């Protein structure tokens, strides 16, 4: 199988050295991910495109490669193509007729051709010859150059013709690793999740900083989201997850700060802490999911007061986006179910928030704050590599792990529905239930308590985490299946 990948247009207009460097980065990223899918996968770079091939005829591998290409930053679009040698225009027509003739009945169509190499014909001549032949020899609805029912794409390159069987939309953006690193202050809600995704899409290596206000379960939920974003969109580059215990900071704010200023002061404390953590990691910018006037702490006056505590750049990719559009992006990238289950803790300390705080009064209240508590939180911050972020042996110690299923046990595939569709799980002689992780806690209550269920995911990380959740909830009939 063969795919032709087109660069995101903003890459194509860069200077020759930059374009060459960024195209190489995208090629390296694709090569790394393609090899994970199949050992025969090859990625070859050319000036205006990248070709991905695999010496295997397997629809599962094909689906995995399509999914990988669709979620890789830096790609405008990509096409599944078939290559054939040719000697004449009529050879090209016959190839197209064999592939497309049966699909044109009663439909309008057009033929689009790109050509490179030395030939005695032009791209337009190929379009006319092939299009005319198709129209004469098939019961079509006629040629229509604008908005046809079927658009047939082909590329003539030297002595080969590339027939496009299907075209796919890419993610856009810049290749991961072409830009600098940023630190995303992630809470797990829609806003910070989508903001993190937008930075990854733009090619920035995005590290995660989580201020824990809600205890262990909140932290594990946010780790799931960060791991999902990294694993799906940025796994070619390692990043870190930093968890900062912020309960003490919140407690101090509740005691020392008036109700109208609490939300803004909390954000100021987060930026102070985030700046310190970023500097430790050599990171030059922080990222937040704030949008103008979405809540009272996010008005222009209040954002100005919040930003005044740091000299570091604070990036806000969602600053003028509507909440509906943010949720739509979350849904599109597969993160909506994660964020919908994460409680928003920042708002609980703002009883009567002010949309325009008095800076002098706020700073006077902040002077009462015991900053040793903030220092203590920073000293106790936990730094983990993102690929190990949920692989905590102590937390998973009580979970039964099996490679062979006990008699009468059933398997629950808890992977995201897109992964279930791409790589269906089959276990000979056993029933496999497909219950995505975000539905598991609700669905598990309805299952037969006399049956033992073993959770499955690709790496055993998510399954171990959710098995632990169920054990904590009082269920004893749960384990992890690692074949």
Curated annotation (Swiss-Prot):
User: Is Ribonucleoprotein found in the keyword set?
Assistant: no
Q: Which UniProt keywords apply?
A: ATP-binding, Cytoplasm, Disulfide bond, Nucleotide-binding, Redox-active center, RNA-binding, Thiamine biosynthesis, Transferase, tRNA-binding
Residues reported to bind ATP: 185-186, 267, 289, 298
According to UniProt, this protein's pathway is: Cofactor biosynthesis; thiamine diphosphate biosynthesis
The residues covered by the Rhodanese domain are 405-483
Q: Which SUPFAM superfamilies match?
A: Adenine nucleotide alpha hydrolases-like (SSF52402), Rhodanese/Cell cycle control phosphatase (SSF52821), THUMP domain-like (SSF143437)
Q: Which residues form the THUMP domain?
A: 63-167
Tell me its EC number(s), please.
Answer: 2.8.1.4
Reaction it catalyzes? [ThiI sulfur-carrier protein]-S-sulfanyl-L-cysteine + a uridine in tRNA + 2 reduced [2Fe-2S]-[ferredoxin] + ATP + H(+) = [ThiI sulfur-carrier protein]-L-cysteine + a 4-thiouridine in tRNA + 2 oxidized [2Fe-2S]-[ferredoxin] + AMP + diphosphate; [ThiS sulfur-carrier protein]-C-terminal Gly-Gly-AMP + S-sulfanyl-L-cysteinyl-[cysteine desulfurase] + AH2 = [ThiS sulfur-carrier protein]-C-terminal-Gly-aminoethanethioate + L-cysteinyl-[cysteine desulfurase] + A + AMP + 2 H(+)
Which residues act catalytically here? Answer: 457
Q: Where is this gene product found?
A: Cytoplasm
* Name of a matching Pfam family: ThiI_fer
Give the intrachain disulfide bonds: 346-457
| Molecular functions per Gene Ontology | ATP binding; CCA tRNA nucleotidyltransferase activity; tRNA binding; tRNA-uracil-4 sulfurtransferase activity
- InterPro entries, A to Z: Rhodanese-like_dom, Rhodanese-like_dom_sf, Rossmann-like_a/b/a_fold, ThiI_AANH, ThiI_fer, ThiI_N, THII_Thiazole_biosynth_dom, THUMP_dom
Q: Which GO terms describe its cellular component?
A: cytosol
What are the GO BP annotations of this UniProt entry?
thiamine biosynthetic process; thiamine diphosphate biosynthetic process; thiazole biosynthetic process; tRNA 4-thiouridine biosynthesis
- NCBIfam families tied to this protein: ThiI_C_thiazole, tRNA uracil 4-sulfurtransferase ThiI
Q: Which family does it belong to?
A: Belongs to the ThiI family.
This chain's function reads: Catalyzes the ATP-dependent transfer of a sulfur to tRNA to produce 4-thiouridine in position 8 of tRNAs, which functions as a near-UV photosensor. Also catalyzes the transfer of sulfur to the sulfur carrier protein ThiS, forming ThiS-thiocarboxylate. This is a step in the synthesis of thiazole, in the thiamine biosynthesis pathway. The sulfur is donated as persulfide by IscS.
- Matching HAMAP family: ThiI (MF_00021)
Q: What is this protein called?
A: tRNA sulfurtransferase
Taxon lineage: Bacteria, Pseudomonadati, Pseudomonadota, Gammaproteobacteria, Cellvibrionales
């Amino acid at each position: 199988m063969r795919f032709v990948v087109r660069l995101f247009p903003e890459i194509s207009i860069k200077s020759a050295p930059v374009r060459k460097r960024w195209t190489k980065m995208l090629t390296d990223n694709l090569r790394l991910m393609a090899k994970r899918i199949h050992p025969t996968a090859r990625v070859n770079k050319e000036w205006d495109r990248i070709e991905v091939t695999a010496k295997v005829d397997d629809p599962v591998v094909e689906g995995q490669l399509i999914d990988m290409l669709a979620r890789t930053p830096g790609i405008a679009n990509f096409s599944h193509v078939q290559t054939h040698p040719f000697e004449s225009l009529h050879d090209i027509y016959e190839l197209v007729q064999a592939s497309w003739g049966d699909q044109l009945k009663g439909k309008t169509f057009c033929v689009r051709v790109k050509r490179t190499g030395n030939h005695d014909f032009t791209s337009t001549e190929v379009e006319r010859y092939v299009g005319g032949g198709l129209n004469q020899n098939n019961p079509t609805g006629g040629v229509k150059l604008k908005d046809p029912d079927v658009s047939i794409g082909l590329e003539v390159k030297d002595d080969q013709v590339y027939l496009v069987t299907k075209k796919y939309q890419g993610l856009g953006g810049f290749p991961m690793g072409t830009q600098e690193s940023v630190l995303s202050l992630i809470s797990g809600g829609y806003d910070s999740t989508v903001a993190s995704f937008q930075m990854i899409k733009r090619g920035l290596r995005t590290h995660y900083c989580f201020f824990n206000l809600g205890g262990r379960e909140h932290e594990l939920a946010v780790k799931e989201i960060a791991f999902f974003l990294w694993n799906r969109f940025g796994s070619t580059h390692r990043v870190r997850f930093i968890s900062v215990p912020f309960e003490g900071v919140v407690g101090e704010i509740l005691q020392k700060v008036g109700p109208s200023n609490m939300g803004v002061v909390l954000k100021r404390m987060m930026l102070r802490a985030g700046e310190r953590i970023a500097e430790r990691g050599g990171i030059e910018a922080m990222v937040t999911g704030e949008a103008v006037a979405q809540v009272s702490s996010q008005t222009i006056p209040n954002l100005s007061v919040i930003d005044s505590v740091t000299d570091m750049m604070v990036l806000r990719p969602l600053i003028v986006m509507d909440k509906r559009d943010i949720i739509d992006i979350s849904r599109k990238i597969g993160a909506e179910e994660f964020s919908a289950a994460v409680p928003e803790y920042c708002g609980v300390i703002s009883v009567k928030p002010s949309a325009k705080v008095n800076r002098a009064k706020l700073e006077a209240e902040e002077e009462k704050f015991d900053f040793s508590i903030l220092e203590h939180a920073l000293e106790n911050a936990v730094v983990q590599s993102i690929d190990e972020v949920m692989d905590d042996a102590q937390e998973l110690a009580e979970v039964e792990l099996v490679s062979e299923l006990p008699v009468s046990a059933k398997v629950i595939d808890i992977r995201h529905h897109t992964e279930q569709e791409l790589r269906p799980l089959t276990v000979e002689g056993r029933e496999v239930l497909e219950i995505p992780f975000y539905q598991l806690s609700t669905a598990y209550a309805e299952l037969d308590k006399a049956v033992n269920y073993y959770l499955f995911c690709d790496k055993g990380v998510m399954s171990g985490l959710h098995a632990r959740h169920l054990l904590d909830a009082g269920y004893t009939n749960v384990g992890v299946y690692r074949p």
